[in-house]
């Protein structure tokens, strides 16, 4: 799949390997990740296959950089892939894998794990909101534009935001239900057995629901 992500980016503009790395860390990070060490070997393979063409660009005071462009063969390969039906993707979520066996650790430790994960997704959501704000300030609402590139970029960003919101809501619900479960099973006050940060989240969730 990495090659198709690269072809997609190159279909928009010429990019160096370093610029591709930056794009993977920004515009498409919310649905596809790639390590720097993966990008250059893949570019080399794709160049050998004729899907991209590299051109060395000299610079007066900086090192010469190699800029890549998608070829006609690369465009055909990308379009062929775009027209293929996509199956449901296998989900790999380490947090959910742990959650499946959280009965093996104390509830307060499980609560800390969930609360920490919520914090991470809060940060990620904030990052996507910043991207959304910058995009809107520069180009207007991407979902109301007549530019097809901006429109589809906007849709994928909308997905990323919705995913983070869903995950945060799940974490809050899980903390609330865990507190109730612990009180039910052990017969202790949920607030006494839930870490302080998680208590605040649970209390906030309860207040919002009320």
Tell me the role of every PLM-derived stretch.
Residues 111, 118, 122-125, 132, ...:
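Heptad-repeat amphipathic alpha-helical coiled-coil interaction surface used
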Residues 80-130:
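Amphipathic alpha-helical dimerization/coiled-coil segments
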Residues 132-155, 185:
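Acidic interhelical loop/turn segments
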Residues 205, 209-210:
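N-terminal/domain-start alpha-helical segments
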Residues 173-192:
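Long amphipathic alpha-helical coiled-coil segments
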